[in-house]
């Protein structure tokens, strides 16, 4: 446990240092931009003492500077002592709104819905997500994300399972390209 605390403390220190030394970039996404992000983090099943390692890969397209439509592929892997490890993959389209308060820190809120599957079952999943994109250069950002996922076999069951989902937090690096940026000379 002590090693894990040291790891988290080091990661938090590195993240804070990265944010503090980063040169603010004038790089807010514009309509027509594409975005790709790779992220890793942790997944915690609500009401349990277990968690899992999480890896995300996502692609998004900015419909406007605010609205982004995309798809996320995620893999949650649970390492179990004295038992079989387990995994759950999710494929979820998402729609988020990016708030442009300035050009280098872009918070967002959104929804995702799709399927969750493993080697035994396929179910539906949906939930809210939120986070912030901190631009480190014109086209590169640090992404901090949180999402809640709940699962259902039918839409009638979705309401009953709202408090039996997963909390997923990730940190990743993303790239934005394309779009119609105005150039200044």
Residues of each region from the PLM?
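Bacterial N-terminal signal peptides that target proteins for export
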Residues: 2-12
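Bacterial N-terminal signal peptides
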Residues: 11-21
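Short glycine/proline- and aromatic-enriched beta-strand/turn motifs that initiate or cap beta-hairpins
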Residues: 23-63, 68-69, 73-77, 166-185
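Flexible, solvent-exposed coil segments and beta strand-coil junctions
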Residues: 33-38, 106-112, 152
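Gram-negative (and chloroplast) outer-membrane scaffold detector with strong preference
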Residues: 58-129, 134-140, 177
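Predominantly the C-terminal beta-signal and adjacent terminal strand-loop region
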Residues: 76-81, 134-185
């Amino acid at each position: 446990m002590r090693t894990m605390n040291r790891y988290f403390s080091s990661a938090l220190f590195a993240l804070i240092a990265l944010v503090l030394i980063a040169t603010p970039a004038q790089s807010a996404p514009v309509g027509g931009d594409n975005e790709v992000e790779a992220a890793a983090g942790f997944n915690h099943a609500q009401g349990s003492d277990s968690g899992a390692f999480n890896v995300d890969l996502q692609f998004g397209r900015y419909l406007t500077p605010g609205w982004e439509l995309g798809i996320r592929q995620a893999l949650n892997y649970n390492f179990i002592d004295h038992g079989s490890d387990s995994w759950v993959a999710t494929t979820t389209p998402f729609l988020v709104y990016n708030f442009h308060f300035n050009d280098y820190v872009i918070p967002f809120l959104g929804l995702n819905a799709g399927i969750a599957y493993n080697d035994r079952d396929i179910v539906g999943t949906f939930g809210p997500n939120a986070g912030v994109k901190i631009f480190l250069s014109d086209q590169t950002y640090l992404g901090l994300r949180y999402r809640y996922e709940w699962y259902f076999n039918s839409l009638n069951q979705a309401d009953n399972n709202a408090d039996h989902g997963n909390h997923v937090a990730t940190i990743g690096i993303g790239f934005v390209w394309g779009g119609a940026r105005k150039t200044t000379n």
